[in-house]
């Protein structure tokens, strides 16, 4: 059985962490390496860096950031945002990222998943999906940070993506994102019924109880959150103790 993973998410722009992290005495709250080290020491299992840098020219700062993080942090980390080509993915992996997440570029060009998986292996390729529930009860995949309906059915898309070579799914509920009311359990369960790759739950975490709940009630193997970790509202160590007490497989 796969161990359950707690995964903080950091937004980076121009090689700097955008949202301040207040849960530890960081000398430089905007430094991704300091933030990553602090999370590593706090006991997280993996990290996700989401690059919200706007232009292609500025990506060199991201590559440099990845290199610095890889030198000093010894847990797996994923980099996502702005990955459009096999070459983009290659640069991130060569710099030291363990996995690379693709989102809208995979929707625009599904073959990208197959090309990347063939070159680097499925274990490096993470499909990031933003989804929202529709009036008919189905879920649609959204683009542009959840602002634009792609028209694609979520369950169809994840099955296609996995068949092409995606080795993991980072699934964000746009309905739950930012609400702190708990993860979208029905959506996670629906996706886990149609694919067999690991799923990271994202969107809605507001407490350690929500993290416990997503692992007890769905097949998700990872729980991702940002602000509850950044602002020290939830202790990773305490959450893991609760998970262990509940009989879940976890790295202490």
Swiss-Prot record:
The chemistry this enzyme catalyses reads: 5-[(5-phospho-1-deoxy-D-ribulos-1-ylimino)methylamino]-1-(5-phospho-beta-D-ribosyl)imidazole-4-carboxamide + L-glutamine = D-erythro-1-(imidazol-4-yl)glycerol 3-phosphate + 5-amino-1-(5-phospho-beta-D-ribosyl)imidazole-4-carboxamide + L-glutamate + H(+)
Location in or out of the cell: Cytoplasm
* Gene Ontology MF terms in the entry: imidazoleglycerol-phosphate synthase activity; lyase activity
Q: Which domain of life is it from?
A: Bacteria
Q: Which UniProt keywords apply?
A: Amino-acid biosynthesis, Cytoplasm, Histidine biosynthesis, Lyase
Pathway membership, UniProt: Amino-acid biosynthesis; L-histidine biosynthesis; L-histidine from 5-phospho-alpha-D-ribose 1-diphosphate: step 5/9
Q: Which catalytic residues are annotated?
A: 11, 130
Pfam families assigned: His_biosynth (PF00977)
EC numbers for this chain: 4.3.2.10
Query: Which GO biological-process labels does this protein carry?
Result: L-histidine biosynthetic process
What InterPro entries does the entry give?
Aldolase_TIM, His_biosynth, HisF, IGPS_HisA/HisF, RibuloseP-bd_barrel
- GO cellular component, as recorded: cytoplasm
Q: What does this protein do?
A: IGPS catalyzes the conversion of PRFAR and glutamine to IGP, AICAR and glutamate. The HisF subunit catalyzes the cyclization activity that produces IGP and AICAR from PRFAR using the ammonia provided by the HisH subunit.
Tell me the HAMAP family matching this sequence: HisF (MF_01013)
What family does this belong to? Answer: Belongs to the HisA/HisF family.
Oligomeric and partner information: Heterodimer of HisH and HisF.
PANTHER family reported in the protein's UniProt record: IMIDAZOLE GLYCEROL PHOSPHATE SYNTHASE HISHF, IMIDAZOLE GLYCEROL PHOSPHATE SYNTHASE SUBUNIT HISF/H IGP SYNTHASE SUBUNIT HISF/H
Write down what this protein is called: Imidazole glycerol phosphate synthase subunit HisF
Task: Identify the species of origin.
Answer: Streptococcus sanguinis (strain SK36)
The organism's lineage is:
Bacteria, Bacillati, Bacillota, Bacilli, Lactobacillales
């Amino acid at each position: 059985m796969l161990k359950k993973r707690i995964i903080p998410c950091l937004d980076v722009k121009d090689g700097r962490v955008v949202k301040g992290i207040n849960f530890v005495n960081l000398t430089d709250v905007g430094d991704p390496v300091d933030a990553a080290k602090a999370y590593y020491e706090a006991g997280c299992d993996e990290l996700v860096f989401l690059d919200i840098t706007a232009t292609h020219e500025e990506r060199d700062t991201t590559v440099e950031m990845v290199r610095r993080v890889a030198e000093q942090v010894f847990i797996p980390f994923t980099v996502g945002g702005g990955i459009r080509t096999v070459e983009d993915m290659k640069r991130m992996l060569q710099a030291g990222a363990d996995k690379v997440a693709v989102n809208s570029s995979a929707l625009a060009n599904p073959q990208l998943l197959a090309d990347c998986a063939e070159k680097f292996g499925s274990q490096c390729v993470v499909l990031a999906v933003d989804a929202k529930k529709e009036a008919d009860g189905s879920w649609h995949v959204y683009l542009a940070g959840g602002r634009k309906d792609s028209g694609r059915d979520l369950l169809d898309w994840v099955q296609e993506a996995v068949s092409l070579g995606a080795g993991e799914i980072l699934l964000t509920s746009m309905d739950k994102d930012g609400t702190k009311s708990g993860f979208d359990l029905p959506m996670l369960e629906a996706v886990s019924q149609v694919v067999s790759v690991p799923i990271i739950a994202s969107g809605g975490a507001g407490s350690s109880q929500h993290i416990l709940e997503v692992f007890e009630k769905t097949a998700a193997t990872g729980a991702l959150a940002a602000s509850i970790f950044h602002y020290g509202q939830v202790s990773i160590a305490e959450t893991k103790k609760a998970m262990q007490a509940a009989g879940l497989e976890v790295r202490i």
